[in-house]
Amino acid sequence: MKLLILFLAALGAASARIRGHTIKG
């Protein structure tokens, strides 16, 4: 279960980064 939470957290961070990059660019 911990691994799943960690994976979701990493995915959310990557998504936020991509979203911010898209808005900036």
Curated annotation (Swiss-Prot):
Q: Which domain of life is it from?
A: Eukaryota
Q: Which UniProt keywords apply?
A: Behavior, Secreted, Signal
GO molecular function terms attached to this record: hormone activity
The record's subcellular location field reads: Secreted
Q: Where is the signal peptide?
A: 1-16
Q: Which GO terms describe its cellular component?
A: extracellular region; extracellular space
Biological processes, Gene Ontology terms: negative regulation of female receptivity, post-mating; sexual reproduction
Record function comment: Responsible for physiological and behavioral changes in mated female flies.
Designated name of the protein: Accessory gland protein 98AB
What is the source species? Drosophila melanogaster (Fruit fly)
